[in-house]
A protein has these predicted regions:
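Basic nucleic-acid-binding interfaces
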Residues: 1-73
């Protein structure tokens, strides 16, 4: 199993953009990402390093694996 990478909020936004998510709103220190044809949205904090729990939650919401994340780093 691959280890969870250290990812910043901005890097996570770039990764999700490659999978069809687009940043719709930036409020305060958070990006709100949306995918076309979906009412679901993902909130990504603008931190230097996202905690492992936040990364796991974003991966679960976006239906991504660790391998898909590390491929685009």
């Amino acid at each position: 199993m691959t280890h969870l990478p250290v990812v910043s909020g901005f890097e996570m936004v770039k990764i999700l953009t490659r999978f069809g998510w687009t940043p719709k709103i930036q409020t305060g220190s958070q990006y709100i990402m949306k995918k076309q044809g979906s009412t679901f949205r993902i909130v990504i904090p603008q931190h230097r390093e996202l905690r492992p729990g936040i990364i796991h939650q974003i991966m679960k919401e976006a239906d991504l694996s660790i391998e898909q994340i590390t491929k685009y780093l």
